[in-house]
């Protein structure tokens, strides 16, 4: 029987003209048979720290720091993996490539997932719903992936409150975006970023090795096609 993985995908500042310099797509993956354990462990941590509601990068504060600090350690000490791709939006030139921003978005999501799909395994892919267009984007992505793979068991949109791992994806991705934008006003967020960087052994402004599985960070250079 083939091993199955769940991917929990999210995006940050992905709208073309939102005034933000970077577009980030990311996911956390887990072996399916360990999903229940991770959900239970995270919920127990929330209870321990009297944390209510969703984990979000925007929610990190001095009072919530102990919970998020433990959550980062949990991620790096577990079998969970994270991958993100970063696009510098100043390099976007959709007219040159005869595409819309939605077309580009679909292509980037494919690039996010394509490099880590193993034909020997099966996959359930979940995408955080953002708006009414999310369903169409998910359908397009499913079409792209099924063109090259026959092991995508399920691809659907869900709301972040339905998934602890989707929420954790938001936290890790938020740390990357915060660091790249040079923001540093919230001490608790700075400390979380420093903790992630200690685990990774490098700053969040640098790409990781392509073969890195635990925390894979890739900066796409649209000008040079890589």
State each model region's role:
Residues 1-226:
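Phosphate-ester processing/binding pockets and catalytic centers
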């Amino acid at each position: 029987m083939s091993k199955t993985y769940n991917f929990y995908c999210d995006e940050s500042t992905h709208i073309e003209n939102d005034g933000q310099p970077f577009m980030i797509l990311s996911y956390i993956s887990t072996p399916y048979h360990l999903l229940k354990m991770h959900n239970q462990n995270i919920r127990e941590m929330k209870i321990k720290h009297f944390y209510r509601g969703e984990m979000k990068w925007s929610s990190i504060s001095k009072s919530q720091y102990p919970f998020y600090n433990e959550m980062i350690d949990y991620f790096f000490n577990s079998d969970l993996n994270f991958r993100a791709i970063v696009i510098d939006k100043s390099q976007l030139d959709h007219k040159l490539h005869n595409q819309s921003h939605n077309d580009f978005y679909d292509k980037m999501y494919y690039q996010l997932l394509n490099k880590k799909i193993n034909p020997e395994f099966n996959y359930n892919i979940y995408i955080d719903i953002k708006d009414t267009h999310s369903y169409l984007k998910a359908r397009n992505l499913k079409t792209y992936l099924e063109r090259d793979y026959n092991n995508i068991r399920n691809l659907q949109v869900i709301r972040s409150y339905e998934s602890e791992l989707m929420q954790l994806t938001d936290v890790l991705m938020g740390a990357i975006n915060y660091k790249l934008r040079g923001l540093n006003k919230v001490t608790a967020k700075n400390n979380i970023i420093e903790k992630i960087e200690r685990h990774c052994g490098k700053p969040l402004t640098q790409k990781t090795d392509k073969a890195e599985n635990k925390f894979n960070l890739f900066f796409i250079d649209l000008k040079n096609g890589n």
